[in-house]
Each structure stands twice: as structure tokens, then as C-alpha cells.
Amino acid sequence: MMARRDPKSWAKRLVRAQTLQKQRRAPVGPRAPPPDEEDPRLKCKNCGAFGHTARSTRCPMKCWKAALVPATLGKKEGKENLKPWKPRVEANPGPLNKDKGEKEERPRQQDPQRKALLHMFSGKPPEKPLPNGKGSTESSDHLRVASGPMPVHTTSKRPRVDPVLADRSAAEMSGRGSVLASLSPLRKASLSSSSSLGPKERQTGAAADIPQPAVRHQGREPLLVVKPTHSRPEGGCREVPQAASKTHGLLQAARPQAQDKRPAVTSQPCPPAATHSLGLGSNLSFGPGAKRPAQAPIQACLNFPKKPRLGPFQIPESAIQGGELGAPENLQPPPAATELGPSTSPQMGRRTPAQVPSVDRQPPHSTPCLPTAQACTMSHHSAASHDGAQPLRVLFRRLENGRWSSSLLAAPSFHSPEKPGAFLAQSPHVSEKSEAPCVRVPPSVLYEDLQVSSSSEDSDSDLE
């Protein structure tokens, strides 16, 4: 009988029995879902996703074929551009595009304003715009700037200048013009004086190392210029008065008449290098600068003795026989006038080229033997160009404060030579020992007196 039983049926019975036993042993509760279904309460430890465990075949860490890109839960149209490489072409443009097209078609409102502003800066009158407004856009197309701000509308009138400022500026311009006009004669005179040095520059040997100063010349009177040099020649001074008397006589014969009125030229304090022409009766006082000038020496034609000290200033009759000297404007004698009183030589003249080497072409001049003062007779032009004029004589005097003052002495030929007392009465400081022969002295006596240095007082004490 056992053989008659089918093994298949026996197996079926066994499976049923096992299933029944499992059903009995199962706890009472919710049934677990099948393995293919997702449970959102589960979380995979490998990938961190919900719906499966680490042992599930849905985990992408174990089965790469099942790893899919997570899709979005829901699509929302209009949030993102699925094809950004293709620009969106809209059949109906929006309101912004419509406004932009209208602005390009119609003329711009700010074009007339820009044109008016352009005409205001250029100075041209603005043109009247056409009624339709199309003519203004054609001429100002090059001025359009898409990103530029609109200009402020202004009128084409230029700003008016304040009358107070205009009057002040006019006054300043007139003041400058008067200053230039006052300086122009001096500049012209400097050119004329430099060009007139030709006739006399070859006749004289004594010259200075400084440039020719600007001289103002009026009329036919000879010009007086003081020429300082570095040193004095140490040759004898007895030969100079003889040549001076000859020159003085020739000048008197060539110029029989002299002008009574001579223009007075204002003089200002200046260094010895710059001197101006002097009129009759004018005084020139100048002081040395704070520093020693490099090329401002003092010209001394003769040797001056240091000792003995001369008395009051006097001019002998022999020095003014050529004519009566003009009355100069006397200076107040300083306390040291008795010790430093200058003296004049009886004869005036010029040096010959053999006595003094010519360094620079300058007008002729000569000075007598004076310890602290000198008289200089000079003429820039020839005798033919100054008929009726006499050479003038400049007298330099040293003051107490270290400055020098100069007075102008004239010697016209039409006066009688028997009246020298007129000048002597007006100038009481004339040396009585002016006819004394000159003595050789060091060439730096007058040069040191005209310089400002700490040893000026010591030199005065040594001379005393």
C-alpha cells in the first residue's frame, strides 16, 4: 500500500502542514509588505534614501543598474527654461517692447534742449525748430548718447559780468598800462645809449668790467655814468691833470653854449653796478648791498692818498676856470665830514690808452685824486652831436652811515671864469689841499669803502 501512494501528493501534504504551522506561530498584528513594495518608514543606511533597507535590492549601492536619477514629484510650467540655448520668440511682444519701439519711431523730446545747449556754448544763435519736430533730429543725431542723462535746459544768453568786477579789472589793466608806459622810455634809452658808444669808445683806454646801465638822456647834455672797477692803476697821477686840461679846453671850444635847464632824473638806491644819468642840481645816494657783488667794482682813475686827512671840501679856482660851475644841491655834512671831506683836482681829463688797458668798451671818464670822493666828467656822444652842451661833473661824498651821495656840477662856457666864489659859497665843504700832488696808495681804498663788510669800521679807524 505504501508503494501505491503517490510521492507528489505526499509532498503536497507536507507543505500544507508547514504553512499551517507558520500561520499559527505568526504574531497577531499588521502584516509586513512584500519586499518589492516601498515603505517610507524605512531608511537605507548605505545610500540614506527612504523606502528600503540596506539589504534590499532597490538600494543603488548594491545594484547600480537600479540606481536612477530621482525625478521631481510634480512639474510646474513656467518656472524653469528647459531649453536655454534657444531664445524664446514671442509672437506678441510685451508692453515694454512696444514702448521701446514707439520711442525709436517718434522724435526724442530732449533733442531741442540739447541743440540749444550746444548753441549756447558755441556762441551761435539757436535755430528755430520745425513745427513737426523732424528738422531738429537730423542736425543733432551725432550728439545722441543712449546712456547719457538729459541735460538741463538753459537759455542761450551768456552770463553777465558784475559791473564792480568789470570796473576793477579795467582799473588794473589801466594801471599796468601806465607802468609799462613809464618803463618804455628807459628801455628805449638803454638801446640808444648802447648804440651811441661808437664815436668815443675808441678814444678811451679806461673801461669797466660791468655792463652798460640803462641811461635816460634828454636834450643835448652829456650823460654822466659812474663806472666802478675792481682795481685802480698804480701809475703816477701827475700826468692825468695835464691831459685833462687839454680835453676840458677842447670840449669848451666845441660847445660854446650850454642849456640852463637840465631835466632832473629821479635816482633810487641801487648797487654801484647800476647808475642813472643825473640832472643839474640832483643828488644820488646809493648804498652797497648785503653781499659783495661779483662784477661790481668801483672805477678809480687816480691814486688816492690815505694820509694826511684833508680839510673841508673846496674846489680851487683853477679847476673851474673853464666856466662857472652850476650850483649843486648841497647835502647836510655828516659828523665825519671834516675827516672824510673830498677834494678835487685842478685839472680834469681822460686817460690815454697807454696808461690804462682797455677791458671793455665804455664811455670816457676821468676823476681827480680824491681820498673818499671823486668827480667824473664824461660824454657818451661826440662834440658835433651835442653843440652847446658842456660836460658835467659828478661829486661823490661818503656819508656817516657808510653810504655815498653824489651831486652834479656843471661847467658852462658862457659864464665868466672870475666867479668861482658862487659855487664855493654854496658848497663850504671844499678841500683846501686839492692842489696837492697825488700819492701812490693801494688800489682798494675806494672799493673797500663802498662795500658792506664787518671790517668797514676798522678801516676807518686805521685811516684816522
Swiss-Prot record:
Top-level taxon of origin: Eukaryota
Stored Pfam families: zf-CCHC_6
- Which residue intervals make up region (Disordered)? 1-42, 70-389, 415-437
Which residue stretches does the UniProt record annotate as biased composition, category Low complexity? 180-197
Instruction: Specify residue ranges for compositional bias: Basic and acidic residues.
Output: 74-89, 97-114
Stored InterPro entries: FAM90, Znf-CCHC_6
The UniProt similarity line reads:
Belongs to the FAM90 family.
Any idea what this protein is called?
Protein FAM90A16
Q: Which gene encodes it?
A: FAM90A16
